[in-house]
Amino acid sequence: MPYFVWSHAGRTAGDAAITMSPAASATFPKYRSVDGFGQSLAKHASASAATWVCDRGAAGLEAVTRIFIPSGHNIGAQSVVVASDDNGSFTSPTTLATITTAAGLIENALTSSTERYLRVSIPGAGSAWEYGEMWLGRLRTPSSAVRVEPGWELPPIQNTTVQRFPSGVQGSVVNGGDQRTLKMTLSWVAGTDLTLFQDLAAACGGAKSPLWVGAPDDAVPTTLMWLTAISAWRQDSEFPQATGPTYTVQLELVEALG
């Protein structure tokens, strides 16, 4: 079953709510850790064990259940600790995850937390740590009642134009990055599943903001994407059951490149 993460605690809280220790480098500012683009690096100003803290402004906000640190970071093999607390001093922190990291995309489940303060701690002093995003959000996935229609696709986008001139010379133009698109149709959507896709459309439809998408096949890496269209809100059955109608929803997404 596919899954989606579009909530982003740091982006919602804003740049002023983020504290990096050691402080962020002037040339790699902290806002890049929450801008949602994933590849524009934020960097600590000195080589030291480091923390990234988000003050969400209040407790009881939407839970965080997943963390993403996109590929391109220099964290390497560390034991990164994610914690939350109801006060900024972290006198009684709750550990949400301890992650043995590696190169490439870091994705890990978190113990659900609605506490006000979130902290990511990176040990070691070998480097001034840098990363493209500290994305802590809520994972949402359709229930087992939803059917993913066969034939979903993840093809590369056509990004090259080839021209042949009268002289016989041939030239090509690359239009944008090497991106993939995802087209997926889901049927028997109702109840909380219908709410999920309505929320998704409201938050991300028309490429308003990027989101992480886990494809139906676990072998496909989780990908940061734009939701370009959500359509085909079509009733599945001509004679719906007494519990109410179900719907078919079609998603069209394109890979987001930072």
Task: List the model feature ranges, each with a label.
Residues 1-51, 57-63, 68-79, 87-88, ...:
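Extracellular/virion structural assembly segments
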